[in-house]
A protein has these predicted regions:
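ABC-family P-loop ATPase nucleotide-binding domain
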Residues: 1-39, 273
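ABC family nucleotide-binding domain
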Residues: 28-253
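C-terminal boundary and immediately downstream tail of ABC-type ATPase nucleotide-binding domains
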Residues: 2-4, 8, 248, 252-273
Length: 273
């Protein structure tokens, strides 16, 4: 089936993938997403501590780290689900504190897939996928249906189009969530631990879809502990702890030659099982 979206002029053009260890930023080329000295507090708890990061179009970035290290907070600040307290975040040159302009750049450029699937239970799969394009983009309903059919085919569940979320497995629901985000034609996809709520036998079907998406050139920022996925698709792997970026590098160096003690300890624990 032909992609019903207009051609993406830049989203599928991989940027140079930078490497760095222990540093707080990973530049290289023009950054589509830029964070500078970002802090985030929840009361007295500092969830993000002076985080700087650049992500170029086409890059695939994996963020890992122990529970409470700030991974999900970082990705939620990028999508404006949390508001950072200090520093600056911009997407495509637009600062996220810029009111209506920030909302527009997020709506037009950023898709997000959560740990929980967040599908509307009272809507069919077709309705879940077409609601955003029709309501937010003003797309013709028939065109929106074509989008839904195309992306359900891409995530390998076209036969589920008329079902409701409760009739699908967890893995199928997460694939619907991915298809729903893609229907909005984002330039970057954010994934917040997309497999952590799934039964083990369903994890691979979601990871397979994510790998195929990465192979199309989609810009991806993934919070995950699936290290096999990171080794396979990431341009850069970032390790966070205590709200800081402790280390970042290309996968081969990150996994085979980690520089920081905290990174070494984390990898020894997570790769031992």
């Amino acid at each position: 089936m032909r992609d019903p979206h207009p051609a993406r002029s830049s989203a599928n053009s991989p940027a140079n993938s930078p490497a760095g260890t222990g540093g707080m930023s990973g530049g290289g080329g023009t950054a589509f997403i830029s964070l500078r000295n970002v802090d985030k507090y929840f009361g007295d708890f500092q969830a993000l501590d002076d985080v700087s990061l650049d992500i170029g179009l086409g890059q695939k970035i994996v963020i890992c780290g122990p529970s409470g290290s700030g991974k999900s907070t970082l990705i939620r600040c990028i999508n404006r689900l949390e508001t950072h307290d200090q520093g600056a975040i911009s997407i495509d040159g637009v600062a996220l504190d810029d009111g209506a302009a920030a909302r527009a750049v997020l709506r037009n450029n950023v898709g997000m897939v959560f740990q929980q699937f967040n599908l509307f239970p009272h809507l069919s799969i077709l309705e879940n996928l077409t609601l955003g394009p029709v309501r937010a983009r003003g797309l013709d309903p028939q065109k929106a249906r074509e989008l839904a059919e195309y992306y359900l085919e891409r995530v390998k569940i076209p036969e589920q189009i008329d079902k409701y979320p409760h009739q699908l497995s967890g893995g199928q629901q997460q694939r619907v969530a991915i298809a729903r985000s893609l229907c909005m034609n984002p330039k970057i996809m954010l994934f917040d631990e997309p497999t952590s709520a799934l039964d083990p036998e369903m994890i691979s079907e979601v990871l397979d879809v994510m790998v195929e998406l990465a192979e199309t050139g989609m810009t991806m920022l993934c919070v995950t502990h699936e290290m096999g996925f990171a080794k396979r698709v990431a341009d850069r792997v970032i390790f966070m702890d205590f709200g800081e970026i402790v280390e970042q590098n290309v996968p081969e160096e990150f996994f085979n030659n980690p520089k920081q003690d905290r990174t070494q300890l984390f990898l020894s624990q997570i790769l031992a099982h």
